[in-house]
C-alpha cells in the first residue's frame, strides 16, 4: 500500500504528464506536431502596420539560449575581421546555411510526417528534407553543400537535427562569421505550451572554434502568413550599392 | 489545463536571441544608409519596381535649388510589405507622396524608405526604422 505523500506525488506526475499532452498539439503517433508556418523574427512578425503598431508578446515560457560571441581561434578571429557586410554571401542571394537560415526575417513552413520533416524556407527558396533516423546516420557520399545534410531523431519531445556536410562558404550569423567544412550543427526544436518553438543550435568546428558555440531563437507563428516566392536575384541592386561603399 | 504560470514569472527576458537581423532582410542597412537621420521628400511617383529582394519606387522632387531630383526609394521585400498591409496597388505612378527616409551614405539619390504618406493622408511603413531610437522628426 502506498503512503499518502507517495500517492500525491504519483497523482502530480500523472497530472503533469496529462497537462503536457494537453498544452501542445501532437500528431497521431504522439509526437509534438511542429507542422505549420514559423518565423524567427523580423518586421515585428507583421504587426508593424500602417500606424506603426508593433505586436507585443508575453514572456516566453521557454526562452532560447542566450547568444554568446563566437569563440574563434586567434587566426580565425583575425580572418573574420577582414570581411565587411559587402562580402555577405546572402547579399548575392546565396543560401544562408545552418543555423543562419533560421534567423532570416522571413517565414518557413515545417511539414512533419512520422518518417521525415521537411522545412520549406521562403528565404532564398531553401529547403531541407530531413529523414528521421534514430542513429543520425548521414549518407556516405556527401559532398560539401551550402545547407549541409540533415538527419533527425526525437529526444523526448525535442526534435534533434544533426547537420553536417557543409561547404565553407556560408556565415554562421553576422558579418565575417566564417567556418570550415568541418562545421557540425546540432539543432533542437522544442514545441512549447505558448505555441512557440524554442530553437537552439550548437555549433562545433574544431578547425576554427576553440569550443562549441550555441545560438538560438524563439520561433513564432506569424499571423495569416503562408510561405511565398522570394526570387532574390530578380532586382538585386545591393551588390552594386555595397561594392560602391566598400 | 493551465499554462505553467510559474515558468512565465521566472522568465524576465523576451526571447528573441537572433535579433541582429539584417533589417532590410537581405543586406546591412547600417552599411548602406545614414541610419540616424531622416529626410523628408515630397514628390511624384515616376516608376515602381515591385521586386525582390527589395521594392524600389522613384519619386521626382525638387531640391533646395529648385532642381528636380529623381529619388530611388528602397523598401522591404514585396511579401513583407504585403503582410504588413502595404500592397502593390498603394504605389501609383503620378501620385504625389511624402516619404520619410534615410539617405544613402554614398551621397547618391537613393533612399531607404521608412514611412509613406499617400494622397489621401494615410500612412504606411515601406521599410524599417534605422537608428536604435525612433527619430523625433519621423512624422
Regions found by a protein language model. Give the residues of each.
Chain A
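Bacterial N-terminal signal peptides that target proteins for export
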Residues: 1-14
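PEST-like low-complexity, intrinsically disordered acidic/proline/serine-rich tracts
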Residues: 2, 20-246
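Hydrophobic core
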Residues: 14-20
Amino acid at each position: 500500500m502506498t503512503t499518502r505523500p507517495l500517492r500525491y506525488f504519483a497523482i502530480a506526475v500523472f497530472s503533469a504528464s496529462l497537462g503536457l499532452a494537453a498544452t501542445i498539439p501532437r500528431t497521431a503517433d504522439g509526437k509534438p506536431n511542429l507542422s505549420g508556418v514559423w518565423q524567427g523574427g523580423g518586421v515585428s512578425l507583421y504587426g508593424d502596420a500602417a500606424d506603426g503598431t508593433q505586436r507585443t508578446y508575453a514572456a516566453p515560457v521557454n526562452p532560447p539560449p542566450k547568444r554568446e560571441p563566437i569563440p574563434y581561434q586567434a587566426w580565425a578571429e583575425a580572418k573574420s575581421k577582414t570581411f565587411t557586410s559587402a562580402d555577405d554571401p546572402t547579399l548575392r542571394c546565396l543560401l544562408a546555411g545552418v543555423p543562419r537560415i533560421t534567423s532570416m526575417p522571413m517565414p518557413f513552413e515545417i511539414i512533419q510526417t512520422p518518417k521525415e520533416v521537411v522545412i520549406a524556407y521562403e528565404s532564398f527558396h531553401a529547403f531541407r528534407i530531413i529523414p528521421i533516423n534514430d542513429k543520425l546516420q548521414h549518407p556516405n557520399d556527401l559532398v560539401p553543400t551550402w545547407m549541409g545534410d540533415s538527419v533527425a531523431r526525437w529526444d523526448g519531445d525535442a526534435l534533434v537535427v544533426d547537420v553536417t556536410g557543409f561547404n565553407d562558404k556560408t556565415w554562421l550569423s553576422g558579418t565575417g562569421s566564417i567556418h570550415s567544412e568541418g562545421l557540425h550543427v546540432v539543432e533542437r526544436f522544442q514545441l512549447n505550451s505558448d505555441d512557440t518553438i524554442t530553437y537552439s543550435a550548437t555549433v562545433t568546428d574544431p578547425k576554427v572554434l576553440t569550443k562549441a558555440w550555441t545560438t538560438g531563437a524563439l520561433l513564432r507563428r506569424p499571423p495569416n502568413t503562408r510561405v511565398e516566392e522570394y526570387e532574390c536575384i530578380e532586382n538585386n541592386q545591393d551588390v552594386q550599392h555595397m561594392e560602391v561603399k566598400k | 489545463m493551465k499554462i505553467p504560470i510559474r515558468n512565465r514569472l521566472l522568465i524576465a527576458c523576451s526571447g528573441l536571441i537572433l535579433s541582429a537581423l539584417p533589417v532590410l532582410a537581405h543586406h546591412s542597412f547600417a552599411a548602406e544608409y545614414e541610419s540616424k537621420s531622416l529626410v523628408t521628400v515630397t514628390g511624384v511617383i515616376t516608376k515602381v519596381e515591385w521586386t525582390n529582394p527589395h521594392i524600389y519606387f522613384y519619386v521626382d522632387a525638387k531640391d533646395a535649388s529648385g532642381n528636380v531630383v529623381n529619388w530611388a526609394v528602397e523598401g522591404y521585400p514585396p511579401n513583407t510589405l504585403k503582410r504588413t498591409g502595404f500592397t502593390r496597388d498603394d504605389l501609383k505612378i503620378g501620385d504625389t507622396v511624402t516619404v520619410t527616409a534615410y539617405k544613402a551614405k554614398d551621397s547618391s539619390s537613393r533612399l531607404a524608405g521608412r514611412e509613406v504618406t499617400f494622397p489621401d493622408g494615410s500612412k504606411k511603413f515601406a521599410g524599417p526604422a534605422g537608428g536604435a531610437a525612433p527619430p523625433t522628426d519621423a512624422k
